[in-house]
Every structure is written in structure tokens, then in C-alpha cells.
Design a protein with these regions (language model features):
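Acidic, metal/ion-coordinating pockets
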Residues: 1-436
């Protein structure tokens, strides 16, 4: 039987306060999302009462929200939330445990983090009228201490997120390689790592590769220079194996990935390793890859008739409403450790030359609804939304259905960033669809 699987999705939910009592756009947005039997998004905060120990690192800002914020998030109709992102471990193991506990209380499916790598990488299973759907969640942007570890016969695993590691390589001319070698010699920038390599604590360099300050450089054979990246084979294999295993019992597998990495110097292009990883997931049997991370839309690719959303941008973006920040944050910005969080956030804004809150694309996104039959996408439409950039502060940073003028701008932008994938988009009758 050829069953149709219906999926709707949103981008990153960075919610820090309750939804406004008079906020009405939750209704049309919920109505659109409820078309899907799988309704998914990335929860980009921990959920706690605010008493968990802060990690010594964060995903940029230490994030935790009250359980009431989770309740408001679910008003949109989501039945799956990914928790693998750069904020997963902002409040250490206790913060992760609290988040999972609150999701279980609300009976929300989740994936992407857990007590060990097995739990973090296993899919959530959602029951639909078309059968069971598996959702895997993974993240490429994290501090190394945040990734989950495997348990062994001798030791327990480590709580954390499902990691997608990657490697970078820079190709330069022989002349530039000589320049770097001279700089390394006079500065000693490679000294400690060279010593550790001699002692066996770091793997030997491959032939033809040199290191400078922890970055790998390869001498170009044809004079071209540039950067490349590739996904970690171990993490790819773990994910591919999970997809194939899930396909044995589920009607479809969806992969959610959170990635802040960029190709060059802007947030519009997916990094090389992310494209390679997404293709590997589809090749292994996944029906779609849904990305988030960089706070603005990236291109959409149809790979073997399966959609890859490289980044859906923001759904709720309330970073400036953080109410708790540890001493580490205040010290970073030269403030007294007892300073209020609002003042700490304002200090960061003061010293930025290109604030996220001044970029229109950060406030624009799309919500995809798509249908899958026999592993392929048979229908795809996008609801254009905007996050109230020009509204009063109390009404900003939450989603509204975009007006026609804004929707057309979103369609034009999406066409531009999707051009490398051969997809063009147009606004038609309240939706953004593939250009005929």
C-alpha cells in the first residue's frame, strides 16, 4: 500500500518568555503546521527552573527557559522537538536531564541528546496513520565536552548531544606554505602540538599536509587555493546505520541537523561537509533532511526527489530576553559578576558592529509542509513567516504570517540562495512554491 506521509516543520525555537496573551497569529500558524502528522522543530534552549549549574562554556549565550515557555511552544502543535544544538549542554548534565524530563512530562517526542551516545543518536519514533516515522537529530556546532560518549564494558557512557564532527583543509601554493613555515618557525605557534605529535598524543600528519595553529594546509598541485571540509566518517556511518536500521520497521526516516558552520564569509551558503552529509542521509534511505542553526534561511535542494532544507532560520528568536547568565558571561564582557542579565546582553549589543537584530533576513523564514510517498517528496509548499522586526519590542521575535510584500521578498531571497541547487521559488496564493 502506498501511504502518504505528511510532515510540517519550523526552524529554531529560542524562546525565553511567555507568548503574549493577545497574540493571534499562533492560530493560522498552528493550522498550517497541523497539516502534518509529524510536526517538528529545534528547541534551542534548555528547560529548567534556573537552578542548574552552568557549564564553563555555552553555545554563545547560556540559555534556559521555564517549563511554561515549553507549554507555549506546544501551542503551535509540535509533536517532535530536536534537542541537539549548540545550547544543549549550556547547563551541563543537570540541565540536559531537566530538559528531557520536561519533554517527557508533556509527552513530546525528542531526539538528539541523552545519557550516552546510544541514546543521543537513536531516533524518535512517531506513530501516524501512514505508519511509524523515525526522526534522527544531530548537531555539528558544539564544544567537544558537549558530545555524548559511548558506554563500554568497563565504563558508563557520557551524557551529551549526538555529534556530527567535521574536518577542514586549506589548499595553498608552495610559496604561501613556505611563508607559513617561516612564521611557525619564528613564533613557535606549532611547538606544543609538534611535541605532542612526537610523543604520540596527536596522530602523524598525512603526507603533503602541514599544520599551522591547529589548521591543516595542503600544497596545491595546480596553483588554486581555497578551503574544503568533510564530515567525520565515524559520525556519518553511525547516522547512516541508524537510518538503515529504522527503515527496516518505519515507513520513513527524517533527519534533523543543527549547523552554524559556513562555507566562506556569510550565512547564506551551507558548508561543504553539510551538503555531503545530507546527501549521504538521503542515499541511505532518509526521505528529508531538515536543517537549522545560522539564524537565517539557506537554500533548499531536491536531491533524488527528497527535500533538503539546509537551514530554516528562526521560528522564535528571543536571545535578548535571557533572564539568567553565569559569572563567566559577565567576566567575558568586563562586567561585575552580579550584573543583571539584561545589562550583560546590552553590553554585547553595544560592542557588535553587525548585530543579528539589525538583519532583515534574521526575521524572515518559511515553514515547509511536504508529503512523502514511497520515499519521495510528492508535494511541497512553504508558509512565509516574519518575526516582527518592525513591531514594538513586546511583539517582536515571534512568528507572524508574512504579508504579501514580505512574502515576495522571502521568495526572491530563497531563489537566490537556492540557485546552486537548481530550485526556483515563487509566491502564489499565500504560499511559496516551486516555480513552474
Amino acid at each position: 500500500m502506498n501511504r502518504t506521509i505528511r510532515v510540517s516543520a519550523a526552524g529554531d525555537i529560542l524562546i525565553m518568555k511567555r507568548l503574549l496573551p493577545g497574540y493571534q497569529d499562533v492560530l493560522p500558524i498552528r493550522e498550517f503546521l497541523m497539516q502534518g502528522e509529524v510536526r517538528m522543530a529545534n528547541l534551542e534552549t534548555t528547560i529548567s527552573a534556573g537552578s542548574c549549574y552552568a557549564s564553563a562554556y555555552s553555545g554563545g549565550t547560556w540559555l534556559t527557559a521555564d517549563a511554561k515557555c515549553l507549554e507555549d511552544t506546544l501551542r503551535y502543535g509540535f509533536n517532535f522537538l530536536g534537542i541537539s544544538n549548540n545550547h544543549t549542554m549550556d547547563y551541563s548534565y543537570e540541565g540536559l536531564a531537566s530538559t528531557i524530563c520536561e519533554l517527557k512530562k508533556k509527552d513530546v517526542a525528542y531526539a538528539g541528546a541523552g545519557k550516552n551516545l546510544y541514546e543521543a543518536s537513536r531516533p524518535a519514533i512517531l506513530d501516524t496513520t501512514a505508519g511509524q516515522i523515525a526522526v534522527i537529530d544531530i548537531c555539528s556546532t558544539f564544544e567537544n565536552a558537549a558530545r555524548a560518549g559511548s558506554q563500554t564494558e568497563r565504563q558508563p557512557g557520557r551524557p551529551g548531544l549526538n555529534p556530527l564532527r567535521f574536518s577542514e583543509k586549506y589548499t595553498i601554493t608552495e610559496k604561501h606554505a613556505q611563508d607559513l613555515a617561516e612564521i611557525a618557525e619564528v613564533t613557535g605557534i606549532n611547538g606544543l602540538r609538534d611535541l605532542h605529535r612526537q610523543e604520540g598524543f596527536i596522530a602523524p600528519l598525512p603526507e603533503g599536509v602541514m599544520e599551522f595553529g591547529g589548521k591543516m594546509f595542503e600544497i596545491s598541485k595546480d596553483g588554486t587555493e581555497g578551503r574544503s571540509s568533510g564530515p567525520n566518517p565515524i559520525d556519518v556511518k553511525r547516522t547512516v546505520d541508524a537510518i538503515r536500521e529504522a527503515k527496516m520497521t518505519c515507513e520513513a526516516v527524517l533527519v534533523m541537523v543543527h549547523s552554524h558552520e559556513i562555507r566562506k564569509d556569510n550565512d547564506e551558503e551551507a558548508d561543504y561537509f553539510l551538503e555531503e552529509f545530507a546527501h549521504a542521509c538521503i542515499d541511505a534511505g532518509a526521505s528529508a533532511v531538515i536543517g537549522g542553526g545560522t539564524h537565517q534561511l539557506k537554500g533548499i535542494e531536491l536531491y533524488h526527489d527528497c527535500p533538503i532544507f539546509y537551514c530554516l532560520g528562526n521560528f522564535i528568536f528571543e536571545n535578548q530576553y535571557v533572564r539568567l547568565l553565569p559569572a563567566d558571561y559577565m567576566e567575558k564582557y568586563g562586567l561585575n559578576i552580579h550584573t543583571a542579565a539584561s545589562i550583560g546582553i546590552a553590553r554585547r549589543q553595544e560592542q557588535s558592529s553587525h548585530s543579528l537584530y539589525e538583519i532583515p533576513e534574521v526575521y524572515r523564514s518559511v515553514l515547509p509542509y511536504f508529503e512523502i510517498c514511497q520515499g519521495k517528496c510528492t508535494h511541497l509548499e512553504l508558509l512565509p513567516v516574519e518575526l516582527g522586526m518592525d513591531r514594538e519590542n513586546a511583539e517582536k521575535n515571534i512568528p507572524y504570517v508574512a504579508d504579501e510584500k514580505t512574502a515576495e521578498k522571502i521568495a526572491e531571497y530563497l531563489t537566490r540562495v537556492s540557485r546552486r541547487y537548481g530550485t526556483e521559488w515563487e509566491y502564489k496564493e499565500g504560499r511559496i512554491v516551486l516555480h513552474a
